[in-house]
Every structure is written in structure tokens, then in C-alpha cells.
Design a protein with these regions (language model features):
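Conserved NTP/Mg2+-binding pocket subregion across the NTase superfamily
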Residues: 1-86, 168
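Amphipathic, non-membrane alpha-helical segments in soluble helical-bundle scaffolds
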Residues: 36, 67, 86-90, 123, ...
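Extended, basic/helix-rich recognition subdomains
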Residues: 71-133
Length: 169
């Protein structure tokens, strides 16, 4: 708690687990504590959406995250996210849609909700690709991105420009 209260950017985490890290953990690779801009977004979501099972509510122990820090986290996370696209196309595309929604509206929502918001704002070829990513995320489509590299790059570049425009950078 001392790493996030009082609030300061970027926040630091001791340990973070997600299914995407399972293989790394199974091999015994446990990352060191680190400063992570994306944690600002996660903590904001935690305050907004957590369901308390025991102890104090998240809103009682974690301070609000200013929107300026959420926007800063998006800006700082954007290059690394795009660089990690190979083999993680669905997640990257959906995360970019979510970044665009948040940087445009200040709302944080699920990846499929962000895709729903973004799809009508996209050209047909981009919307089709984002729809595939959303369906794969929901388990209604098999992730098959081979042969779509050019289309993926074009969509990623469009989403990147849209995010940067929303952030005024």
C-alpha cells in the first residue's frame, strides 16, 4: 500500500499476476518490483469495479487516480503495447480500442465494450478486423491472424493516431 498511498505517478507494484504471465511463472521467472504506468489504469478500475469479499473497500484504501495520470499512462504504455503485437494481435488491437475510448471519453470499460464503441467510428476494413478481435475475445472466433499483417498494421496505425489525437500529442 505504501507504493500507491499517497498517490504518485508512476505507481509501483511488488507482484502482478495475470494468465498471460503463467508460462513465465511456471518457469520460475518472478519479476522484480517495478514502476508501471499501466497500474494507474488498473487501480482506477479496481476502485470503480471491485467486489469486496473481506476487509475495507478498495475506495477506502486506494486514493482516486487523476484522469491526467490515466492519460499519461496511456501515452507511456502505447509504444510498448504496439511493439508487442506479434503473436498477441487480438489483445493489442482490443487494448488500443480501449485506450482510444478512454483517451476520448475518460471512461474505462472492457475490451469488448471498447470495440463496440470503436467499430462504428472505423472504416469498413478496420471495423471488420476489430469485430474479429472482439469475437475472438468473446470465444466466438478462432484467433487466426496469418495473412492479415498489412491490414493489422494499418488498423494499429489508425488506432495509434486516434489515441494520440485524443491525447493532443
Amino acid at each position: 500500500q505504501k507504493d500507491v498511498v499517497p498517490w504518485k505517478f508512476p505507481p509501483k507494484h511488488e507482484f502482478m499476476y495475470g494468465e498471460w504471465l503463467r508460462e513465465q511463472f511456471d518457469k520460475g521467472a518472478i519479476p522484480e518490483p517495478t514502476y508501471d504506468p499501466d497500474l494507474a489504469i488498473l487501480l482506477s478500475q479496481l476502485r470503480e469495479n471491485s467486489i469486496n469479499l473481506f476487509g475495507p473497500e478498495a475506495t477506502e484504501v486506494i486514493e482516486p487516480v487523476p484522469m491526467t495520470d490515466i492519460r499519461r499512462a496511456i501515452k507511456e504504455s502505447l509504444p510498448g503495447l504496439i511493439a508487442s503485437i506479434e503473436g498477441d494481435e487480438r489483445n493489442v488491437i482490443l487494448t488500443l480500442a480501449r485506450m482510444w475510448l478512454t483517451s476520448s471519453s475518460g471512461r474505462i470499460c472492457s475490451k469488448d465494450q471498447a470495440a463496440e464503441w470503436a467499430i462504428p467510428k472505423l472504416a469498413k476494413e478496420h471495423a471488420t478486423l476489430l469485430e474479429k478481435a472482439k469475437k475472438a475475445y468473446l470465444g466466438d472466433y478462432d484467433d487466426k491472424w496469418e495473412g492479415m499483417e498489412t491490414e493489422i498494421i494499418e488498423l494499429v496505425n489508425y488506432l495509434k493516431r486516434s489515441i494520440e489525437s485524443s491525447l493532443n500529442i
